Amino acid sequence: MKKLLSVILIACASLSAYAQSPYIHKVYAYHPAPGQFIGEHYPDVYAGDTYESILARVDSALSGASGNAMITLGAWGGSVTFGFDHDVQNRPGEHDLIVYGNVYFTGEMADGHAVSSSEPGIIWVSEDVNGNGLPDDPWYEIAGSASAEAMREYQVTYYYSTGDVEWIDNLGNTGSIKRNSWHQQDTYFPYWESMDSLVFSGTLLPPNMYDKGNGVIRSVAYDYGYADNQPNDSLAAQIDLDWAVDAEGQPVHLDAIRFVKVQTGVQVDWGISGEMSTEICGAADLHIATSLTDRPLKPKAEKRIRNGQLVICIGSKTYDILGKRL
């Protein structure tokens, strides 16, 4: 009987280990800042939608291994919070995590750096210290290559409008998320959250703009440490949990993490291309993902020419260079 019980316990343990998914298990929160896609696409928004219905759509888009969905976080401060069905281990000398974006390189160079579609998002990670399965424990920022120039304890207030969305930060600077002819929804403001104002707090990265002139602005990717910053198939897109820091920017050691929050890290107006906004296509535990041969990683964004026009392909979906679905 004892032998039979041991066999059953071993079998159950094996099934439990096999059941672990390398990909996002659940999306817990979605709080986008204003932006040109907000209230229109990524996720799609319909009349009568509520925070709960939109959160469910984001969860459906990002959870699992489909690899063809994308969400936008809007301008600086917008965020999404998700978790895995297991603890992502911090293995010494290895990259542990990847958050998938839709970055591509244009083939141009600026000051020795490759020009790209980088829209960097800051990655925050958290343990499940209290064991309740919720992202309510302390967060730690992943300090990427621009961390030394970043501004912590930054805050922006956005004000509802059906025109340009005005904002003011805690330093007294002002600006706006400008409407453009490409996106004609009633408002660029996430109205299901508020019809008045929204306040976002976090870390502000230095601008990574490259001005081509004639109103066309591109970005230069940071070296490492951010979401939607380097192509998905690049080592520079992968994250080492040893890069985690506390609120004062001091390194912390985490044995493992369960939850991830990604937040648009820059406040940049791309001219005719609209605001810079982090886009997310999923995430994976690299220690599990690299051991699975029957489940491919999320596809990278690829440049292609169709009918003489540059387009961006992510999986089975195609977008123009301004992010409009074709």
Question: Predicted segment positions?
Answer:
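Short, ordered coil/turn segments that flank beta-strands lining enzyme active or ligand-binding pockets
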Residues: 129, 306, 321
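Hydrophobic h-region of N-terminal signal peptides that target proteins for export
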Residues: 8-18
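Short loop/turn segments immediately following beta-strands, especially the blade-tip
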Residues: 126-132
